[in-house]
């Protein structure tokens, strides 16, 4: 695997993790600014290598899937997200793209609004009566929060006025004003309840209560900013006109909505709002800029995940200066040793920050950082922000160099740094307590074996008390042994045992992912499972055979081969199977028996599809015997090019590979 492929894999894994925490668990670990930075970095890398873009990349989708605790509502009109810009130059480039697409030299009229920092919702009115409400979810399917939305006093249960459409779906943001947030946390501290990190978390947690009576006690409010379904009625032909109409029908709309007739007017609006931000009484993280004319919006259209006629102009992350008092080293699941700066505590964006990630030795060298230095930190996460730079002009006299350990700080094993990699790793494997903990946490995680109720603190105790050394030991736990753990009663212990038993029935792909093989994420695990079909076949595969799997190169193939060549790993797998871990036998697709032009072909999808999602297209192609790869090579038989196909299309043409468009694909799928 090339270094850029490794970067892409790590970035996508990190972004998916934070999408899940943000959209599903309502417990984000990082602020939007850091998420945006990660997404921006991923987009920039993918722009350098479009042939490495995969259908499941976070850049190709809107958000994360919803929980199943609520009923689900499918959005008849998808709730898309907005693309972001972060500086004046990027906004001016966006403005120029819009003008170029419209083939106009005249200034566009922009409607500018606040970008609220809450939870996006859709509310459906039929004949003026509120009938349902849903979260955005993944943009296609959200959670039914009707009962909770009905408790928000700002949202009318019935619209008033004339010419109300038969069906009207409004979109907007539910949020918690600063005063309400402070009161909730004050009450929580007094009663020993949950204290929220910020108003957005509090709003999301309040809105997604299973008991609407709890939601009703929270001072949530709402601003409307758009429309989804519109049937049996008409709306004005400008965005501002629609907002004013919503307001006339009784829907709350922000009073900070302004028409701007030039790019400079937009920039003035942005800076004025940024200046007023501390006095608004509620959290925002930027401004939203939309083409005011609905006719022009229609002309501009959409890209895969966002409209071309709107953009979010985000505020910069907040920064502060403080001192590095020490540097400690943490060990992760794969043995990666990460330096963490211990800081003189400082308030950043309302959070007391005392730690900052330093990533790796290269980053420390790049910063020129020493213990004792004065540094600028940016709040890149609620837990561990990042050091942006060293204030060299104010370097104290008594600073010390940061020395990377030559032995693991946890188990004492040697450490190694593979040439070409930035990461230093402990070589101790499962004899290292830190790696053991993180490996087990990964094994039981939701996307791996999905052991409900077995959280990080339980794993920590199990390892520290030496109850568990390998994943197989988890399935030997009894309720009696678990009851001895902190805060674990008999009922909770039995629930964990039941969850472990339930998790024994899994899939081959999940099992492979749970093993924690280096560089094998969910997508690669699924590819390996689909290609080899059985564990026995995979274990017997050579490095050359492994590279025949779509998107598996020499680096990943070597990691997989070495993992199964290690006797201790084979022993653990044998123990897991002996404890009853199993999955359904593979459904073998005989491509010779499939009457389809795609059977046995290696196919690459590129560009955006309008008739179906890439995931749906991929599923249908696989069902017809195709192998769907993420990049074009000499092995590729066919490229399906959607709108705005890029370098994959160019490479296919260069290699003389057959190319078809979406319409031809759909025709062949039905053949």
Curated annotation (Swiss-Prot):
Catalytic residues, chain numbering: 115
Enzyme class: ligase
Catalytic activity: NAD(+) + (deoxyribonucleotide)n-3'-hydroxyl + 5'-phospho-(deoxyribonucleotide)m = (deoxyribonucleotide)n+m + AMP + beta-nicotinamide D-nucleotide
GO CC field: cytosol
EC code: 6.5.1.2
UniProt key word Nuclease: no
Residues the record lists as binding NAD(+): 32-36, 81-82, 113, 136, 173, 290, 314
Pfam families cross-referenced by the UniProt entry: BRCT (PF00533), DNA_ligase_aden (PF01653), DNA_ligase_OB (PF03120), DNA_ligase_ZBD (PF03119), HHH_2 (PF12826), HHH_5 (PF14520), Nlig-Ia (PF22745)
GO BP: DNA repair; DNA replication
Cofactor: Mg(2+); Mn(2+)
Binding locations of Zn(2+): 408, 411, 426, 432
Keywords: DNA damage, DNA repair, DNA replication, Ligase, Magnesium, Manganese, Metal-binding, NAD, Zinc
PROSITE patterns: BRCT (PS50172), DNA_LIGASE_N1 (PS01055), DNA_LIGASE_N2 (PS01056)
InterPro entries registered for this protein in UniProt: BRCT_dom (IPR001357), BRCT_dom_sf (IPR036420), DisA/LigA_HHH (IPR041663), DNA_ligase (IPR001679), DNA_ligase_AS (IPR018239), DNA_ligase_CS (IPR033136), DNAligase_adenylation (IPR013839), DNAligase_N (IPR013840)
Keyword Endoplasmic reticulum recorded: no
General function of this protein: DNA ligase that catalyzes the formation of phosphodiester linkages between 5'-phosphoryl and 3'-hydroxyl groups in double-stranded DNA using NAD as a coenzyme and as the energy source for the reaction. It is essential for DNA replication and repair of damaged DNA.
Recorded family membership: Belongs to the NAD-dependent DNA ligase family. LigA subfamily.
Record-linked NCBIfam families: dnlj (TIGR00575), PRK07956.1 (NF005932)
The protein, known as: DNA ligase
Source organism of the structure: Salmonella typhimurium (strain LT2 / SGSC1412 / ATCC 700720)
Gene responsible for this protein: ligA
């Amino acid at each position: 695997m090339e270094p850029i492929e490794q970067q892409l894999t790590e970035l996508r894994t990190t972004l998916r993790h934070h999408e899940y925490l943000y959209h599903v668990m309502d417990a984000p670990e990082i602020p939007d600014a850091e998420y945006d930075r990660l997404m921006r970095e991923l987009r920039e890398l993918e722009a350098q290598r479009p042939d490495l873009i995969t259908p499941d990349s976070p850049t190709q989708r809107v958000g994360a899937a919803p929980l199943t605790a609520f009923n689900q509502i499918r959005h008849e009109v998808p709730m898309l997200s907005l693309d972001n810009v972060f500086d004046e130059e990027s906004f001016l480039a966006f403005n120029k793209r819009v003008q170029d697409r419209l083939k106009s030299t005249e200034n566009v009229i922009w409607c500018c609004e606040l970008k609220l920092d809450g939870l996006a919702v859709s509310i459906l009115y039929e004949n003026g009566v509120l009938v349902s409400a849903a979260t955005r979810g993944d943009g296609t399917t959200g959670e039914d929060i009707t009962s909770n939305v009905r408790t928000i006093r700002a949202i009318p249960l019935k619209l008033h006025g004339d010419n109300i459409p038969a069906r009207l779906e409004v979109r907007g943001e539910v949020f918690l004003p600063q005063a309400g947030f402070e009161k909730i946390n004050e009450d929580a501290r007094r009663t020993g309840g949950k204290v929220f990190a910020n108003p957005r978390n509090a709003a999301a947690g309040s809105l997604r209560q299973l008991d609407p009576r709890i939601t009703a006690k929270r001072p949530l409010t709402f601003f409307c900013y758009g429309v989804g379904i519109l049937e049996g009625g008409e709306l004005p032909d400008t965005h501002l006109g629609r907002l004013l109409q919503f307001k006339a029908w009784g829907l709350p709309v922000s009073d900070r909505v302004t028409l701007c007739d030039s790019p400079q007017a937009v920039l003035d609006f942005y800076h004025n709002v940024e200046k007023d931000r501390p006095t608004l009484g509620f959290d925002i993280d930027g401004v939203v800029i939309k083409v005011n004319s609905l006719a022009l919006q229609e002309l501009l259209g959409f890209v895969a995940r966002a409209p071309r006629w709107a953009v979010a102009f985000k505020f910069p992350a907040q920064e502060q200066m403080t001192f590095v008092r020490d540097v400690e080293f943490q060990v992760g699941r794969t043995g990666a040793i990460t330096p963490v700066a211990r800081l003189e505590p400082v308030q950043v964006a309302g959070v007391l920050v005392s730690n900052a990630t330093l990533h790796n030795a290269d980053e420390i060298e790049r910063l020129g950082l020493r213990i004792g230095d004065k540094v600028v930190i940016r709040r890149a996460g609620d837990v561990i922000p990042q050091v942006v730079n060293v204030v060299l002009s104010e370097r104290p006299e008594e600073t010390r160099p940061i020395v990377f350990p030559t032995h693991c700080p946890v188990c004492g094993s040697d450490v190694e740094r593979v040439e070409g990699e930035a990461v230093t790793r402990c070589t101790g494997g499962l004899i290292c307590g830190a790696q053991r903990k993180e490996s087990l946490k990964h094994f039981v995680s939701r996307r791996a074996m999905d052991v409900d109720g077995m959280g990080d603190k339980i794993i920590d105790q199990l390892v520290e008390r030496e109850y568990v050394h390998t994943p197989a030991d988890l399935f030997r736990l009894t309720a009696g042994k678990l009851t001895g753990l902190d805060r674990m009663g008999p009922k909770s212990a039995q629930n964990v045992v039941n969850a472990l038993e339930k998790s024994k029935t899994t899939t081959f792909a999940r099992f492979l992912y749970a093993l924690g093989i280096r560089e094998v994420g969910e997508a690669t695990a699924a590819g390996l499972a689909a290609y080899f079909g059985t564990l026995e076949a995979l274990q017997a595969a050579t490095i050359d055979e492994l590279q025949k799997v779509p998107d598996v190169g020499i680096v990943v193939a070597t990691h997989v081969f070495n993992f199964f060549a290690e006797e201790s790993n084979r022993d653990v797998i044998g123990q897991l199977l002996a404890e009853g871990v199993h999955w359904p036998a593979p459904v073998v697709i005989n491509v010779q028996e499939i009457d389809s032009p795609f059977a046995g072909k290696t196919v690459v999808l590129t560009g955006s599809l309008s008739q179906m999602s890439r995931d749906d297209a991929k599923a249908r192609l696989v069902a017809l015997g195709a192998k769907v790869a993420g990049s074009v090579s000499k092995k590729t038989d066919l490229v399906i090019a959607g709108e705005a196909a890029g370098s994959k299309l160019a490479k296919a043409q260069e290699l003389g590979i057959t190319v078809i468009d979406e319409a031809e694909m759909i025709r062949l799928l039905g053949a």
